Structure formats: structure tokens, C-alpha cells
A protein has these predicted regions:
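Surface-exposed, charge/polar-rich loops and edge strands
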Residues: 1-167
């Protein structure tokens, strides 16, 4: 993130960053993963498909009806190859979690500043994330409701929005 290898596509609000940073600091943990994506790499897809042929380590459905299935990559050679291929991915993109990412970075920077002999390998130098290739995502609309036109007529409001966006 600090080296611009994790790309953001939306602005964050300082008050939300502050709140998330306080939460991470109080808990001394990032409790919710950031959702990242990358341009698919055929070899990574192949490894995932291979691992998924085995029985999962965890296969649960939460009370809200969402299924979670987890496999573990145990083969050391395969792990090394995955690390090498992921190191070759030019960028990751935040699909969900801009405020969590910003808070994790702020937390890490504060801990780094308070740790004079930091090596760069401390737990605060990373944050929890899930990563999916772009070809396995379905991007759905995320719409906002405008309740106050701030004194503008609907036509004026749409004209203002049209200055920045395609309508």
C-alpha cells in the first residue's frame, strides 16, 4: 500500500479512518480482512484448482446462510511457486476495505515509530486480506440515495453530477 502496489480507487474519510484505527489499536488486531483482487494468472488458477480437488479443511455455513470453504496448501514446492507468482503480480486492487486498509497502514506506521529496532517482519507490518483473481468476481451495482439536493432543482443537480460523471 505504501509502495503503491495495492491500488485504491476511492477516497476515504478521515473520521472513519480514525475510528477504524482506534478499533485496531484497542484490539491489537485486524479482525476483518480486506478484499483484494488482481489480474488473473493462469498458473495461480491452476494451483487453486489442483488444491480444491482435495477435501476442504473447513466447510461451514454461517447463520446468515453464507458458505465458507477453506483448503490449505501444504506442499512446500507449491507454496514457493505461489509466492513467486504472486510476487510477479504487478498490483493488487482494493475491492472492499479502503478504510480498513488505511487504518491498518496507520496502525502499522504508529507501531513502527514506537519500535526502535523494528526489522520490517513484525506482525504490524501486514494486515489480513483475501485475494481473488478478477475473472472470478462479479461486480454488482452499489448505488447511493440522494435525499437532499442542497437547494438545487433535480435538473440542476443532474447537471452538476454530469460535470463529473457519465449519467
Amino acid at each position: 500500500y505504501e509502495k503503491d502496489l495495492i491500488k485504491k480507487h476511492e477516497y476515504t474519510r478521515k473520521d472513519k479512518e480514525d475510528d477504524r484505527t482506534r478499533h485496531v489499536t484497542e484490539q491489537n488486531a485486524n479482525a476483518e480482512p480486506v478484499f483484494l483482487t488482481y489480474r488473473a494468472v493462469p498458473y495461480i488458477d491452476h494451483v487453486v484448482d489442483t488444491v480444491r480437488k482435495d477435501a476442504p479443511d473447513y466447510d461451514i455455513v454461517t447463520p446468515d446462510g453464507i458458505g465458507h470453504t477453506v483448503w490449505t496448501v501444504r506442499d512446500e514446492v507449491m507454496i514457493g511457486e505461489l509466492v513467486a507468482f504472486f510476487n510477479g503480480v504487478p498490483a493488487l486492487y482494493i475491492a472492499d476495505g479502503h478504510h480498513r486498509t488505511a487504518a491498518a497502514i496507520r496502525y502499522g506506521q504508529a507501531r513502527r515509530a514506537a519500535t526502535p529496532n523494528a526489522t520490517g517482519d513484525e506482525p504490524f507490518e501486514s494486515f489480513m486480506a483475501v485475494v481473488f483473481p478478477h475473472n472470478q468476481l462479479k461486480i454488482m451495482d452499489y448505488n447511493r440515495v440522494v435525499k437532499d439536493l442542497n437547494g438545487l432543482s433535480p435538473e440542476q443537480f443532474l447537471a452538476k453530477v454530469g460535470e463529473k460523471f457519465d449519467i
